[in-house]
């Protein structure tokens, strides 16, 4: 249930500083958000898939930690990122 290579490259080019910037906080949060959105559609059909639900909770927790880190380090980048992603934080 991972993202395709093209989708990942598109997210990296959109949120990264350059085409190879896969490690910045913004890119990591954007990739996690895309994976979370993909899994939410999966759970609409497969309600009893508890194994994948545990992975979803892990991704949500990781995204929350990265957003907290970004908010601590640079509030302007944090607010810009949550507006671009449409998160309700």
Swiss-Prot record:
> Could you give the subunit structure recorded for this chain?
Part of the 30S ribosomal subunit. Forms a bridge to the 50S subunit in the 70S ribosome, contacting the 23S rRNA.
Full protein name? Small ribosomal subunit protein uS15
- Family annotation (HAMAP family): Ribosomal_uS15_B
For this chain's UniProt record, which GO biological process terms are given? cytoplasmic translation; regulation of translation; ribosomal small subunit assembly; translation
What do the Gene Ontology cellular component annotations say?
A: cytoplasm; cytosol; cytosolic small ribosomal subunit
Q: Which UniProt keywords apply?
A: Ribonucleoprotein, Ribosomal protein, RNA-binding, rRNA-binding, Translation regulation
What GO molecular function annotations does the UniProt record carry, in alphabetical order? rRNA binding; small ribosomal subunit rRNA binding; structural constituent of ribosome
What role is this protein assigned?
Answer: One of the primary rRNA binding proteins, it binds directly to 16S rRNA where it helps nucleate assembly of the platform of the 30S subunit by binding and bridging several RNA helices of the 16S rRNA. Binds to its own mRNA, stabilizing it 5-UTR and preventing its translation.
Q: Quote the SUPFAM superfamilies the UniProt record gives.
A: S15/NS1 RNA-binding domain (SSF47060)
Q: Which family does it belong to?
A: Belongs to the universal ribosomal protein uS15 family.
* InterPro entries recorded: Ribosomal_uS15, Ribosomal_uS15_bac-type, uS15_NS1_RNA-bd_sf
- Give one Pfam family, short name only: Ribosomal_S15
Give the highest taxon in the source lineage.
Answer: Bacteria
Answer whether the UniProt record assigns the keyword rRNA-binding to this protein: yes
Q: What induces it?
A: Part of the metY operon that extends to pnp, also has its own promoter.
Specify whether Repeat is a keyword of the entry: no
């Amino acid at each position: 249930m991972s993202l395709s290579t093209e989708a990942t490259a598109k997210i990296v080019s959109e949120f990264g500083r350059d085409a190879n910037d896969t490690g910045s906080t913004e890119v990591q949060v954007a990739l996690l958000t895309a994976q979370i959105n993909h899994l939410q559609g999966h759970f609409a059909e497969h309600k009893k898939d508890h194994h994948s639900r545990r992975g979803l909770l892990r991704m949500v927790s990781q995204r929350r930690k990265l957003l907290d880190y970004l908010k601590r380090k640079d509030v302007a980048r944090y607010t810009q990122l949550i507006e671009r992603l449409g998160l309700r934080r």
